[in-house]
Amino acid sequence: VSNNGMLMSDTQTAYVLALQFNLLSDEHTEIAVNRLVDNIKNYGHLTTGFLGTPFLCHVLSDNGKHAEAIELLLRTKYPSWLYPVTKGATTIWERWNGIKPDGSFQYPSMNSFNHYAYGAIGEWMYSNLMGLKINNNFPGFKRYTIRPLFDKNFDNIDGSFNSNYGKIAISWSRKKGDLKLFLNIPANTKADVILDKNHPGNWAVSYTHLRAHETRG
């Protein structure tokens, strides 16, 4: 870390890894977050690869830059997650541009069209858009956190996870300025629900209990 708080390797991946693994002081963390955002804006896109991409949007959302993470998610120009979709992709590719803008292909020796790495964005979508977060003190989703980050680009988010205790289901919707959050909490589990501080207001709560024989397990 230099005297002005910047990393000696001034790349998106360097900042992402330093922030993800808490390698910086509080003062340097703020500088690193701002520098990461500036770097993304200067390039106009992400520049991370297999190491940095799985943590990029997590780092942005965890440090108050969720809007910037959403912007990366919804980008359709290369390099981005949705660029392959514009080329007809139904899987995650090994390269951001496995099919080039002119329709030609990259060299087949490194051009898998079913590759794991960039698919890590799915976990971020589960834990931030849907809002299901693991509590490391309670393995197996015995207790967990539900903290969806509502965003103006989405009117409906709906998802579920089949835990050992049953299905955890989360959905939220927006209509005429009102937000509605629906949860399904399996029996014998606990959920800590945290509402986005950027959407203050009054929340009306209603719930229904299911009898044990009505649940799976």
Predicted feature residues:
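Solvent-exposed beta-hairpin/edge-strand motifs
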Residues: 196-207
